A protein has these predicted regions:
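ASCE P-loop NTPase helicase motor core
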Residues: 1-58
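A short alpha/beta connector and helix-capping loop motif
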Residues: 2-9, 114-124
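ATPase catalytic-site recognition across NTP-hydrolyzing enzymes
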Residues: 44-106
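Gly/Thr-rich phosphate-binding beta-strand-loop-beta motif of the actin/hexokinase/Hsp70
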Residues: 97-121
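Hydrophobic residues at beta-strand termini and immediately following loops
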Residues: 37-39, 68, 188
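Short, conserved catalytic or adaptor-binding loops enriched in Gly and charged residues
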Residues: 23-32, 86, 91-95, 199-203
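Mg2+-dependent endonuclease catalytic cores in nucleic-acid-processing enzymes, primarily RNase H-like
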Residues: 122-231
Length: 231
């Protein structure tokens, strides 16, 4: 008879493929005449130790369990709880050098909070040195694009901004920024999973730091939880 071969990276333990083909406790799995082989990078003899170490550093948290250890695990609990260490990643009295490049990231929200961060990049590290945060839902007053643009200019005052990086879904706000012709706009990668994975890796490798004055992003890092139904 015919045979099926599958080769895949693990995902959530709630994934249909895991439940139907891999989970030893699943009735659907028990019905199949199948062989499950679990392997990791160490089983690939074509990879050098240097390459394996590089891949090993690329992931952390649940992504390390999935992509390096080959485990089908559920993303649960705090997103950055395992990697964000306040004693290590929060800095005091940080003064960027003359070689620093400056960027502003914007998580634009109408119903959700609007968060803007001024970042200093140097020596392969990014430090959030100032921020603007506004929660229209909590204050019961929504701001216009022009009002948010005014806050952007205040945040950028005194700095040579390379790019303003904005959520691409904030099309009206991007139009407002471009109309003023002061900042160069770069649209952010809107993939939630890629963004979380990259941020976790940068934090784990001590390449992202937060100044203690940026209390809102520090609070968000401490509260941000996985949506177990979607991840």
């Amino acid at each position: 008879g015919s045979k099926l071969w599958f080769n895949c990276n693990p995902d959530s333990s709630e994934h249909w493929f895991f439940k139907e083909w891999i989970d030893e406790n699943s009735e659907k799995t028990a019905e199949k005449n199948r062989l499950h082989l679990h392997f990791t990078m160490d089983d690939n003899f074509s990879l050098s130790d240097e390459v394996k170490q590089r891949y090993d550093r690329m992931y952390s948290g649940v992504f390390y369990q999935r992509y390096i250890q080959g485990l089908w695990v559920l993303a649960e609990g705090l997103v950055y709880g395992a990697v964000f260490d306040k004693s290590r990643h929060i800095v005091k009295n940080y003064t960027p050098s003359n070689q620093a490049f400056y960027y502003i990231s914007i998580d634009y929200g109408t119903l959700n909070p609007c968060s803007m961060g001024l970042w200093a990049l140097e020596h392969g590290k990014a430090v959030r040195i100032k921020e603007y945060y506004y929660d229209g839902r909590r204050k019961n007053i929504q701001k216009t694009d022009e009002e948010y643009y005014s806050e952007l200019e205040k945040l950028a005052d005194g700095y040579n901004i390379q790019h303003v990086i904005v959520d691409p879904s904030a099309s009206s706000f991007i139009t407002t920024i471009k109309r003023h012709n002061k900042f160069r706009v770069r649209k952010a990668n809107n993939s939630v999973i890629d963004g979380i994975r990259n941020t976790m890796t940068l934090i784990e490798n001590d390449r992202i730091f937060i100044c203690e004055c940026c209390k809102d992003i520090i609070r968000e890092f401490s509260l941000y939880r996985w949506d177990e139904k979607s991840i």
